[in-house]
A protein has these predicted regions:
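A polyampholytic, Gly/Pro-enriched intrinsically disordered region
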Residues: 113-124, 175-187
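Bacterial N-terminal signal peptides that target proteins for export
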Residues: 1-9
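Positively charged, proline/Ser/Thr-rich regional signature most characteristic
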Residues: 57-128
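Second-shell loop/turn segments in exported
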Residues: 42-49, 100-108, 120, 132-136
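Flexible, polar/low-complexity N-terminal or interdomain linker segments that lie immediately upstream
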Residues: 8, 17-84, 179-192
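Solvent-exposed loop/turn segments at secondary-structure junctions
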Residues: 75-79, 102-104, 136-140, 162-166, ...
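Active-site or metal-binding loop neighborhoods of secreted/extracellular toxin and effector enzymes
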Residues: 155-160, 164-180, 186-191
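Catalytic cysteine-centered active loop of the rhodanese-like fold, especially the PTP/DSP P-loop
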Residues: 113-166
């Protein structure tokens, strides 16, 4: 019995000593403010530097400003220098899929990929309307919109409920493939 109590006390002490390490490892936000874990969880109603859109507002925007660019930031597995189609993905018609650019901390290649594609689709104009989205309750689009804001883009929109809301409204989705990650970006210090 004494041994059982000692073992139990030892386990409790060991668990309590490990708890702070575990909690520190799963911090929701990085020091620079980007969400870095639990990406599929409730998101805030607003985001600094961007206007939050529902489906009706997005449809109006696309009608009033047809040059608006839609940017899907849903993840896609990257392995051995290429995207792996582990599941079919569909997105809003006319979208550019910039996979893996909504993570909290981007490796340099993904940052270059993001910046280069934004510069290209906006024709270098920081006032070009850009709409970021993912799925509902997805922090990836929140991070990507915030990242674009910090890059100096000024006409930003966050389609908070994303693909799920579009589909629930009975609107069409199209099969999608992520934009290519240029081979030069695979080199750690390559310029865009």
């Amino acid at each position: 019995m004494k041994h059982c109590l000692a073992l139990h006390a030892g386990l409790l002490l060991g668990t309590s000593l490990l708890a702070p390490v575990t909690l520190a490892e799963v911090a929701l936000f990085a020091a620079d403010g980007y969400r870095q874990t639990q990406y599929r969880s409730p998101t805030p109603a607003a985001l600094e530097g961007a206007r939050t859109l529902d489906t009706a507002a997005l449809q109006r925007l696309l009608h009033e400003q047809p040059h608006t660019r839609l940017i899907d930031v849903y993840r896609r597995t990257w392995l051995n220098g290429r995207f792996i189609e582990d599941e079919a993905h569909a997105n809003l018609p006319g979208s550019l899929w910039l996979a893996n650019t909504g993570d909290g901390q981007l490796e340099p290649r993904w940052q270059r990929y993001f910046e280069t594609h934004l510069r290209n689709i906006s024709q270098g104009d920081p006032d070009w309307p850009l709409v970021f989205y993912c799925r509902s309750d997805c922090w990836l689009s929140w991070n990507a919109t915030r990242r674009a804001y910090h890059l100096g883009y000024r006409q930003l929109y966050w389609y908070r409920d994303g693909i799920d809301a579009w589909e629930q409204a009975g609107l069409p989705l199209v099969p999608a493939q992520p934009a290519e990650l240029p081979g030069a970006f695979l080199t750690p210090n390559a310029a865009p």
